[in-house]
Amino acid sequence: MGSPAAVVAGWGAAPAKRARREGSPEGPRGPTAESDRCDPRLWDTERLCQHLSCCGVGEPSLLRRFRESGVTGSMLLDLPACALEVTRVCLPAERLKVLACLNKLRQQHVDVMKVFNDPIHGHIEIHPLLVRIIDTPQFQRLRYIKQLGGTYFVFPGASHNRFEHSIGVGYLAGCLVRALKERQPELDITQRDILCVEIAGLCHDLGHGPFSHMFDGRFIPLTRPDLKWKHETASVEMFEHLIASNKLEEVMKSYGLVLEEDMNFIKEQIGGPIDETACEKSWPYRGRQKEKSFLYEIVANKRNGIDVDKWDYFARDCHHLGIQNNFDYKRLLKFTRVCEVKNQKHLCTRDKEVGNLYDMFHTRNCLHRRAYQHKIGNIIEIMITEAFQKADKFFKIEGSGGKLYQISTAMEDMEAYTKLTDNIYLEILHSSCPELKEARDILHKIERRQLYKFLGETQPETMRQIVKNNSLAESIANSKPEKDPPDVELKAEDFIIDVINMDYGMKEQNPIDKVLFYCKADPSKAVKISKEQVSKLLPMTFAEQVIRVYCKSQDPDTISAAKQYFIQWCIEKDFTKPQDGDVVAPHLTPMKKSWNNMRDDEHRTAAEPSCKQRLPFDK
């Protein structure tokens, strides 16, 4: 019998208006009586026996054995377990008929899956339990948090949000784990495993704050410098709050999940081991045993950074930024398998894909240089951070029990944090509260494009690490040039210093050194491939620092003076020469010898005669 057409649900519509078929879960209170009747996964033993009778396999002795065994509809999710139970309960002559009946029932109910039309992955099927999670205030909150934060102020197409990215990651997580199940049945990947991995992918970004990484990367370190907080921690807390406040525990059980064990597994995929001291143990996780260690490398791969989260944001961000994406995750899906190394199972990639993986990390680096760390996008985020910092004491958010929280403390209460989105930008901008005037003025400058002026960027010439702190602005204010000094006196508060760490995802390490490969000759054996085995044209270093300096003033004379301060500061600190150094401060750059030494190849080129002079027949 052919399967009924699935529902196509658009993301643009409000979740309450999404088209639903009869039998799909309705509302936040759990399955209705109608969905109990139509969705076989929610059937109890008696309802299952009634269906067997309708199929013509309702002999009293068979039904009695089914009732005694306690088989329920949730077992239909896991075909191997279902077949095992049928083999145990049924007589040999009955087994084929019963299995055929139950399998047909499974096939008839693919309409329970919802279909979303995603601009990146096309028409994708989403499990009804994931739809129940999506249709909650905690998940819908992600519609109002920009994926790329302040980058949207520079790239007009980068208007996408954490909402669609999270759905994409949930989908890709399911694609990868299903591909592994089909390719390697011996891994014993169950339907429970698949569902938990999909939920972890879907919920991995629930904890992001306003403007995504601006909140945890700039605002929180500035307002609460002693707090060691990560958005992954908030994602775990928000996931717990989502399940509890929407009473989804019973729904999870109805789809075959074992609540405590699978909740732990989902949270561990998002935030790592629940017990931090457990990291010292040989196996720190509670949700799954060591035999399924590879499942922890799908959503957030702590070992080498190759995970479905990156696969989605590479494709999605490039699409919206208008930047070419040279990495195709679909090819990697076909060449990923599991191998055992030192008593643990890890995701491995075919050896011939090593070049594509270098391309993947190169794509990541290019995205950071061209978009994520754009000099204008960054200064806009710095200005928004300043505005939020000035508004922090006066902006109140109501949490559980009526308690009020600030912007910087809202993540302590998930009810308050649910209300904290990019919308606070507009609330401050359009407020009439006198206490918010300073914050409002900064946001008005952003709206009028009266941004802090970019003076230039530089890098440390040696391998030393520059730590971002207030002393950097003080040192640049003390670097007034002695040769032809400008008339303007500048102070530390006139400067903004932004220190950016660029890398391939693992600081100074080569992430490919952490990747395991397999060869065609023996797909079960994992090997490593060194950089030297791939190409001599690959990067020699995998991390660098970029130091950008801005001036808060809009006055042309002040900006001109600030650029000279900046050049003098680079000379004193032994940093590289800014690209426009010879233009903005031609009287200063000759003072540093290393800035004016041409390389040997430049000397040779200057010394060689031109082609016209060398050719004897050209007279």
Describe the function of each predicted region.
Residues 27-58, 63-64, 73-112:
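Sterile Alpha Motif
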Residues 73-75, 84-86, 94, 321, ...:
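Eukaryotic short linear interaction motifs
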Residues 44-48, 58-62, 72, 80, ...:
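Alpha-helical interaction elements in eukaryotic regulators
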Residues 2-38, 67, 103-199, 207-458, ...:
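Sequence-structural signature of the catalytic-core scaffold of metal-dependent phosphohydrolases
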Residues 2-21, 25, 32, 371, ...:
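Terminal helices and disordered tails flanking the catalytic cores of nucleotide-processing hydrolases
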Residues 100, 186-189, 478, 533:
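Charge-dense, low-complexity polyampholytic segments
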